[in-house]
From Swiss-Prot:
<keyword id="KW-0648">Protein biosynthesis</keyword>
<feature type="binding site">
    <location>
        <position position="386"/>
    </location>
    <ligand>
        <name>L-serine</name>
    </ligand>
</feature>
<keyword id="KW-0436">Ligase</keyword>
<keyword id="KW-0547">Nucleotide-binding</keyword>
<dbReference type="GO" id="GO:0016260">
    <property type="term" value="P:selenocysteine biosynthetic process"/>
</dbReference>
<comment type="similarity">
    <text>Belongs to the class-II aminoacyl-tRNA synthetase family. Type-1 seryl-tRNA synthetase subfamily.</text>
</comment>
<dbReference type="InterPro" id="IPR002317">
    <property type="entry name" value="Ser-tRNA-ligase_type_1"/>
</dbReference>
<dbReference type="InterPro" id="IPR010978">
    <property type="entry name" value="tRNA-bd_arm"/>
</dbReference>
<dbReference type="Pfam" id="PF02403">
    <property type="entry name" value="Seryl_tRNA_N"/>
</dbReference>
<feature type="binding site">
    <location>
        <begin position="228"/>
        <end position="230"/>
    </location>
    <ligand>
        <name>L-serine</name>
    </ligand>
</feature>
<feature type="binding site">
    <location>
        <begin position="346"/>
        <end position="349"/>
    </location>
    <ligand>
        <name>ATP</name>
    </ligand>
</feature>
<dbReference type="InterPro" id="IPR033729">
    <property type="entry name" value="SerRS_core"/>
</dbReference>
<dbReference type="GO" id="GO:0004828">
    <property type="term" value="F:serine-tRNA ligase activity"/>
</dbReference>
<dbReference type="GO" id="GO:0006434">
    <property type="term" value="P:seryl-tRNA aminoacylation"/>
</dbReference>
<protein>
    <recommendedName>
        <fullName>Serine--tRNA ligase</fullName>
        <ecNumber>6.1.1.11</ecNumber>
    </recommendedName>
</protein>
<comment type="function">
    <text>Catalyzes the attachment of serine to tRNA(Ser). Is also able to aminoacylate tRNA(Sec) with serine, to form the misacylated tRNA L-seryl-tRNA(Sec), which will be further converted into selenocysteinyl-tRNA(Sec).</text>
</comment>
<feature type="binding site">
    <location>
        <position position="275"/>
    </location>
    <ligand>
        <name>ATP</name>
    </ligand>
</feature>
Length: 426
């Protein structure tokens, strides 16, 4: 949720953000109008209630016919107060509905446009060339080494499901363990998070549970399967006041994740690039508004550290405004080179959500004066970033393959695989 005071005082800034996203600018003026209506309704209610209180004192002092007349007026006034209160509640609800409809304000420097209008921040490493043999794709390799079974995944659960078995299961567990150890070394608190959350938690994180076709819902329980542990980690401190005096609070959550991929018909139907269920280690940070941009750079650096450990060529892109989720004010993606596709594919992303999620979830920090006396509270900033996920297996198998289909294990991963240096063909 955005700051309505900031929007009212700087509407052009929010209009520009909406334009950059390719979104409707008129919602800005609608929010300003709704806020004015809310304020007016609240003033009417408070004035009538003050008048009602004053009448109450008069009634207490009056006698006889005068008291009866005043009681009649009080009855009429009470009805007016009740109506004004209802009007104020309606105005408040209308404003909140509009506030929940507008995405986060983008930060300075985010490129305008849609999915293809990103900016390449940097490219690290060179895509591997295969002069001596034609590279196999990750699914063919996965079948040769007994790591991936799509056929039985479809038999058991349907399309876009799979089994990781043998070295495939071990490789994923190794990735997740290496990611979690790196996060712990960087000061993150490890978390195993729920994968089912309440609608208010999902909405508070910035997802539209009514219209988002990517979300699985358990209707009988009114619970939602998360597509990232970011959701549970964001809701962890809902309705709390945090102490950030010692620095940011950092969590690393590991969970299974679920996505319906409803808008992906016909895309990436082969292999495990786009699936309904996968595992992930997600970094999540609570910090001050002033420190958010620096934390975003740190998250990106930690993601790049993981990519370097896996010895993968990659690039970092600054995602265009129109391709940002509702909650993100800025997002960097790390994309690894996938040889058989001749393209970079996203492995990680990191988003600065500024105070958007915290306002929706009512997460604040205590603010002190220079003398240390309490000054009040304000919304914190939240950020997230992926450290490892099932999709990494795609890039690792393809980039490190040998002609026979075996795969060289990146040196940093070998200790998590019992010293295994090569994933052999069966």
């Amino acid at each position: 949720m955005i700051d309505v005071k900031d929007l009212s005082e700087n509407p052009d800034k929010f209009r520009a953000s909406q334009r950059a996203r390719g979104a409707d600018e008129s919602v800005v003026d609608a929010i300003i109008s709704a806020d004015a209506a809310r304020r007016a309704a609240l003033i009417r209610f408070e004035n009538l209630r003050a008048e009602q209180n004053a009448f109450g004192k008069k009634v207490a002092q009056a006698k006889g016919e005068e008291k009866q007349a005043l009681l009649a007026e009080v009855k009429v006034l009470a009805a007016s107060v009740k109506a004004a209160s209802a009007e104020a509640d309606v105005a408040q609800a209308q404003q909140e509905e509009l506030l929940r409809a507008i995405p986060n304000l983008i930060v300075d420097g985010v490129p305008e446009g849609g999915e293809d209008d990103y900016i390449v921040v940097k490219t690290v490493g060179e895509p591997r060339e295969f002069p001596d043999f034609e590279p196999k794709d990750h699914l063919e390799i996965g079948e040769l080494i007994g790591a991936i079974d799509m056929e039985r995944g479809a038999k058991v659960s349907g399309s876009r499901f799979y089994f990781l078995r043998g070295v495939g299961a071990r490789l994923e567990m190794a990735l997740l363990q290496m990611a979690m150890e790196q996060a712990i070394d960087a000061g993150f608190i490890p978390m195993i998070t729920p994968t089912l959350v309440r609608p208010e938690t999902m909405q508070g994180t910035g997802f539209d549970v009514k219209h988002d076709a990517e979300i699985y819902r358990l209707a009988e329980d009114d619970l939602y399967l998360v597509g990232t542990s970011e959701v549970a980690l964001a809701g962890y401190h809902a309705d709390e006041i945090l102490d950030l005096s010692a620095g940011p609070i950092r969590y690393a959550g590991q969970s299974s994740c679920y996505r319906r991929e409803a808008g992906s018909h016909g895309k990436d139907t082969r292999g495990i690039i786009r699936v309904h269920q996968f595992n992930k280690v997600e970094m999540f940070i609570y910090t001050t508004v002033e420190e958010a941009a620096a934390e975003h750079e740190r998250l990106l650096a930690w993601e790049e550290e993981m990519l370097a450990k896996c010895e993968l060529p990659y690039r970092v892109i600054d995602t265009a405004a129109g391709d940002l989720g509702n909650s993100a004010a800025r997002k960097f993606d790390c994309e690894a080179w996938v040889p058989t596709q001749g393209a970079y594919r996203e492995l990680t992303s990191t988003s600065n959500c500024t105070t958007f999620q915290a306002r929706r979830l009512n997460i604040r920090e205590r603010v002190l004066n220079e003398d240390g006396a309490p000054k009040g509270t304000r919304a914190v900033a939240t950020l997230n970033g992926t450290l490892a996920t099932t999709r990494w297996i795609v890039a690792i198998l393809e980039h490190h393959q040998n002609e026979d289909g075996s795969v060289n294990v990146p040196r940093a991963l070998q200790k998590y695989l019992g010293g295994l240096e090569v994933l052999p063909v069966l």
